[in-house]
């Protein structure tokens, strides 16, 4: 049985550090989740000596979650084991380098004019770095300086500073040869979102839709020629990773809404959906890029005008309830194969466009959707109608005696005038949310009880005309 507690001493005395960089990389796979989390699988071929050594796995993500790192030997797993691993994220900068030399001697080179006024001469002095708090303090042989009079020359880079984030593993190799190693780990700083662009037809009865995936890399590392996969769904995470700060990004390959592109392959994964890009791609550090997700043409859509009331209308006397009320405009479609879709739609923003009289695509509104499985309906609010307005008023109200278990019993009547300035007739859906138990006593239009507390009226309004919805209701609670 190997005594584990002796490993740090053995490695500190005799272990040889073997560096590996992206030059050794054989393959790379990146799986990104919706929750600012990604799984990295980095395969490299590294020449390891037999026995104990330190492997410095360089150019890993700066936001790696170290406790998730797993190193596998795919070539010579026999007698291969890891005793300890450390994530070195103290990166080399001029400030850090000077800080590490507090109490140590450095050489300061300054330039001064020659006495004869011809040219300049270099002066080299040794100094001890006393402190770096809010500026450098240097002690020379004859004085103390609080600013650096020239450039500093350091004898070497301290071993605890790294140029790039590095995972250092103390391990034992069973063979002296080149070996294929795979490092898997979770990291923050990589995330994706779906965006959709939809073009409405001239008659607003169909649309073409394309979906794009926007990838953002703020993890502090680059991922060249990676197999890219995306997981759509709400994966549970015990400790959510903090969202990265907004900063200036490099944009690469941002998409337009026209033209067809290869779509990402989709498959089920547990209770989620996995999307795989059909080609390797490079995610540069501090970069945002887009890749095609899906596309569909001639998807049937439904246009809806909606006026929604409020439940407080029915418990008091209000009279005028508003003039020129906004009427929402919605478009809906079915995510079915029969409607030219039938694909899982990751959550994201759907932006809708329509061509003007000259053929130019104009933006007409956007809405967000949640993860939407196939065979579900999608409904988007694009804005409020300009030419279709409403006026609502309460024409009567009275409180009735208590009845049975109901202490609050009210009877009230309403009149909703809907005006249409368009050159075509429209149908407006009026949703009236009613509290408690309710009963429609009189009505000018038919209605359906959409839910236990909602009455739904459909009001046809002629072109350049108006219609009036009237009803009387008794509510009890």
PLM-predicted stretches and their roles:
Residues 1-8:
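Sec-dependent signal peptide recognition
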Residues 3, 13-477:
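Long, intrinsically disordered, low-complexity accessory segments associated with secretion
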């Amino acid at each position: 049985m190997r005594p584990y507690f002796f490993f740090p001493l053995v490695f500190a005395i005799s272990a040889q550090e073997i560096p590996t960089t992206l030059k050794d990389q054989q393959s790379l796979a990146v799986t990104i989740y919706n929750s600012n989390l990604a799984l990295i699988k980095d395969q490299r071929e590294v020449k390891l000596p037999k026995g104990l050594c330190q492997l410095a796995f360089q150019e890993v993500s700066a936001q790696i979650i170290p406790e998730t790192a797993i190193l596998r030997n795919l070539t010579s797993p026999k007698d291969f084991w890891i005793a300890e691993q450390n994530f070195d994220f103290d990166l080399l900068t001029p400030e850090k380098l000077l800080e590490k030399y507090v109490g140590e001697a450095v050489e300061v080179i300054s330039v001064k004019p020659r006495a004869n006024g011809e040219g300049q001469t270099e002066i080299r002095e040794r100094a001890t770095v006393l402190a770096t708090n809010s500026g450098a303090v240097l002690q020379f042989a004859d004085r103390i300086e609080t600013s650096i009079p020239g450039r500093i020359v350091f004898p070497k880079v301290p071993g605890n500073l790294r140029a790039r984030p590095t995972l250092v593993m103390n391990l034992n190799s069973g063979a002296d040869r080149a070996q294929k190693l795979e490092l898997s780990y979770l990291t923050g700083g990589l995330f994706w979102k779906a965006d959709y662009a939809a073009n409405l037809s001239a008659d607003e009865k169909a649309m073409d839709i394309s979906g794009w995936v926007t990838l953002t890399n703020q993890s502090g590392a680059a991922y060249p020629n990676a197999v890219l996969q995306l997981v759509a769904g709400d994966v549970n995470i015990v400790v959510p990773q903090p969202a990265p700060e907004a900063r200036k990004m490099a944009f690469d390959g941002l998409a337009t809404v026209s033209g067809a592109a290869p779509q990402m392959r989709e498959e089920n994964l547990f209770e989620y959906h996995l999307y795989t890009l059909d080609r390797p791609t490079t995610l540069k550090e501090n970069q945002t890029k887009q890749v095609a997700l899906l596309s569909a043409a001639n998807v049937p859509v439904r246009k809806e005008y909606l006026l929604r009331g409020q439940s407080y209308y029915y418990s008091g006397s209000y009279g005028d309830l508003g003039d020129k009320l906004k009427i929402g405009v919605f478009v809906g479609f079915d995510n079915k194969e029969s409607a030219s879709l039938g694909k899982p739609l990751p959550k994201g923003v759907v932006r809708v466009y329509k061509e003007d009289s000259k053929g130019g695509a104009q933006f007409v509104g956007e809405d967000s959707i949640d993860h939407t499985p196939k065979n579900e309906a999608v409904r988007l609010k694009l804005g409020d109608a300009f030419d279709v307005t409403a006026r609502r008023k309460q024409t009567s109200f009275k409180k009735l005696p208590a009845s049975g278990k109901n202490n609050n019993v009210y009877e009230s009547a309403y009149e909703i005038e809907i005006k249409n300035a368009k050159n075509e007739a429209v149908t407006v859906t009026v949703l009236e949310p009613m509290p408690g138990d309710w009963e429609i006593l009189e009505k000018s239009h038919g209605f359906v009880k959409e839910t236990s507390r909602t009455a739904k009226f459909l009001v046809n309004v002629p072109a350049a005309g108006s219609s009036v919805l009237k009803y009387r209701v008794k509510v009890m609670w």
